[in-house]
């Protein structure tokens, strides 16, 4: 329905954005926009290769494996190999829904601040498009940097401090500059969502698996992968959770609470 409106539509997927982080950002946008909020359930595992592909394709991961069987053939759960077809997924979704755009779909992935600044300077040309889909990786980078760099651990030692860090980043970001420019665009509609959030993990748990077991910290898959049932959800039949099978003997485990 949003695409039936006369103005441009911007679909922003902010990678790894938690709801409390959105509330921090939203307080700066209320005076510029009319804000409507809706909620929907995420999928498990709540990780980019599964969740973001599901958003752009309109399919569960098991359906993506069936319709696009080569996607999960590499066995690598990284953003490049697993999420490089997002534009094609969205085009196919619009085609299935019989949505006719007034112009070609524009897809942009912002992976560094410099590219974000370039996009802000190009807003005047982007507003001429009917639908522009934008993936913003800054919040995901913030979450990973929080774990990797001691200085950020000191700056954001708890959730309250993490929200404060989010606020500082957002108010000085190219993303906020983009919002301010779009607020001056007549009839512009912005749909903001996320593929997943983040959890501050404090408790480790032992995992048993072979050398082919995936290396992800919050979920793993492989042949007969095991973990303490108190610490992880064990999925022996991936199809029940609409997950790709990846072979006859593959099972998944997904960490609970703040375990990793």
Give residue spans per PLM region.
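Feature captures the catalytic ectodomains and active-site-proximal regions of enzymes
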Residues: 1-260
């Amino acid at each position: 329905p949003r695409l039936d409106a006369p103005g441009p539509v911007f679909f922003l997927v902010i990678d790894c954005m938690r709801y409390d982080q959105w509330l921090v950002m939203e307080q700066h946008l209320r005076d510029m926009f009319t804000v409507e909020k809706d909620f929907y359930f995420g999928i498990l595992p709540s990780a980019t290769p599964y969740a973001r592909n599901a958003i752009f394709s309109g399919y569960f991961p098991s359906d993506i494996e069936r319709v696009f069987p080569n996607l999960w053939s590499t066995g690598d759960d990284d953003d490049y190999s697993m999420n490089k077809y997002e534009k094609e997924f969205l085009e196919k979704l619009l085609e299935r829904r019989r949505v006719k755009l007034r112009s070609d779909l524009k897809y942009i992935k912002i992976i560094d601040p410099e590219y974000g600044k370039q996009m802000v300077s190009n807003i005047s040309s982007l507003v001429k498009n009917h639908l522009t889909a934008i993936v913003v990786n800054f919040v995901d980078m913030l979450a990973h940097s929080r774990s990797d760099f001691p200085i950020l651990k000191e700056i954001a030692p708890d959730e309250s401090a993490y929200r404060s860090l989010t606020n500082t980043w957002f108010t000085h970001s190219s993303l906020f500059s983009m919002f301010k420019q779009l607020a001056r665009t007549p009839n512009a509609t912005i749909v903001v969502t996320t593929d997943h959030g983040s959890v501050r993990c404090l408790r480790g748990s032992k995992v048993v698996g072979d050398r082919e077991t995936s290396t992800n910290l919050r979920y793993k898959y492989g042949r007969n992968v095991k973990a303490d049932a108190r610490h992880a959800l064990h999925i022996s039949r991936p199809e029940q959770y609409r997950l790709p099978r990846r072979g006859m003997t593959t099972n998944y485990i997904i960490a609970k609470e703040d375990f990793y």
